[in-house]
Amino acid sequence: PYNIMELPSYPSTARNRIFISEVLRSYLPKNGTVLETASGTGEHITFFCEEFPKLIWQPSDKSDELFFAIRKRVEAADNVKKPIVVDLLAESFGPIKEDYFGVVNINMIHIAPWEACIGLFQMAEKVITAKGIVYLYGPFKQGGKHTSESNKNFDLSLRAQNTSWGVRNLEDVQRVAETFGFYHVFTHEMPANNKSIIFKKN
């Protein structure tokens, strides 16, 4: 019953997805399965499945609230699996059975409790194959300091909405990653004071 134009949409996706796919191209294999966490409206995975047609994409989110939008957007794609519930704050992460080469997480860890970042790497340790990657995108502090005035203001607005949210410190994220067997490979500077962070499994 849904028209594509009527589906929920985030304008930032259209702005960043091309830049994100350019970074991912350097790290993703030709074949394999990639899990996207916090898929939201499915706008990123809709773009990625066309950009990387030989990869299988698995969308997921903490609830099935927006699955109707994901299903509608990818209904013509043959390389996107049905969306699954993956709650990074839960002790078990839902119906994740197979080995994934990578986990892609875009614009989540600053609008979720810190425990969701821990849960992300805890899950990744269990489901990612050897030498697989975790890709994070979003704003980050470095050395405990904001990299721009706009990020500082954004952080304040996030914390005003929810005290458990906020722009994360990159070094803190790296420590969590290392705890679960991932090392920091590279940080790519992105438009609008965002970063692409690549972690690889030991």
Where are these regions (language model features)?
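A short acidic, Gly/Pro-enriched loop at the edge of an enzyme's catalytic core
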Residues: 94-103
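Class I SAM-dependent methyltransferase Rossmann-like catalytic core
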Residues: 4-30
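Conserved S-adenosyl-L-methionine
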Residues: 38
